[in-house]
Amino acid sequence: MRFWDIRRVENVSLNLQLENGKLEKPRYNKSTSKGFRVLKNGFWGIFEGNVADDEGLRQAEKNAFTQGDGDIEEIATKGRYRMRVKRDPQDMSIEEKVELLKDLEKIIRDVCVSTKLVYFENRRVLQYRDSCGSEVEYEVLRTGVSIMGVGKGRSLQFLSKRQMRVGGYEVLDGVDEKAYEIVEVLPKLVNALAPPSGEMSVVMDSSLAGVFVHEAFGHAVEADHVLQGATVLKGRLNEKVADESVTIIDDPTLPEFGFFPFDDEGVRAEKKVIVEDGVLKSFLHSRETAKKLGGVAGNARSQGVDVPIVRMSNTYIDTHHYSFDELLEECRDGVYLVGSRGGETNPATGYFHFNAQYGYLIKNGELAEMVRDVSLSGNTLEILRNVKIGREIEFDPGFCGKAGQLVPVSDGSPPVLCRATVGGA
């Protein structure tokens, strides 16, 4: 047996949903699960079950039934972490949390034909040990609210806002501002213009630029994709891949939604500079990909006790020196795009296509009419070679899916000016 590890994960979660003023049945879940891995003759054996450690490892070893080329970076980590919060939501009543949703729904009700609000909290406790001598334990709490409304005018439009971070109920301080943003924007959006089309100058807001760096670039630097040859960045370490103003970072130590103190292979979390001054400096690694490619481990994550795979955490474009008004002036004529409604990317080709929540025409360096149903597409590396970056960064929370697993992440960026193709969504 070359290597073994054991993970025990406890999850305690509460989900409340208020749809059109009606409360759905609260969903409370508490689960404990154990995952076992054994590396034998270069092949991984996996077993999941709430059994004694020796039995779990025996079952995992039985599943390592052939030979392979697997290997792992030997790292021994010892540590404990417990998140301190100002207001533990588990000390509060469900009624108080429901009342918050009702108050937020009242704010947006008059501008919506339908509403949906969700409150959630999740406490994750991970215990990890391995044959290298690692012994790690941590507890992290995440809390959040999402607010969604549909409005009707010349068109039917959907708008959503979220406030989610690691921490206790204090995370939701000021969440009513998100509701008031919907009240401000949605009545204008339902009567907004159709967007222009063609290649043009685009200013992405922090939210859309964050989605861009996560989806279009971040997945391309995950080392399992590199090993599979499924990324345009394979073989390009220490090459210039972007404008000198571009620095891209993945940092799980930031107190954002993608925070973790140790990854799911027991490696202590640390800030990773992926691109520095336009030069590709590193990929994101698990212990196995770090061994094969010579990188630094610490980005192996899993949902529950599923097999850990290479994932992002809090990924962002670092700040530069342009103010927002200066970006508009540099743009002169084009569009300003706000928020994201999803899209698609292909790390192997660098192509991406995203839908913004809404936007504004930019005329003579100033914001003009609002536009709706607008999309953005282009080639990731071509866009990054010709950008101007703002100086005020914001982060957006979300869940990232890969290989059937969802993990919490954040992406962030200042506003970014680029050239891209714009069209209808």
Swiss-Prot record:
Q: Which Gene3D superfamilies does the record associate with it?
A: PmbA/TldD superfamily (3.30.2290.10)
Q: Which GO terms describe its molecular function?
A: metallopeptidase activity
Q: Which GO terms describe its biological process?
A: proteolysis
One term under GO cellular component = cytosol
Q: Keywords in UniProt for this one?
A: Hydrolase, Metalloprotease, Protease
Give the EC number(s) under which this enzyme is classified: 3.4.-.-
Q: Which family does it belong to?
A: Belongs to the peptidase U62 family.
Q: What task does this protein carry out?
A: Probable metalloprotease.
Record protein name field: Metalloprotease AF_0655
Q: Which organism is it from?
A: Archaeoglobus fulgidus (strain ATCC 49558 / DSM 4304 / JCM 9628 / NBRC 100126 / VC-16)
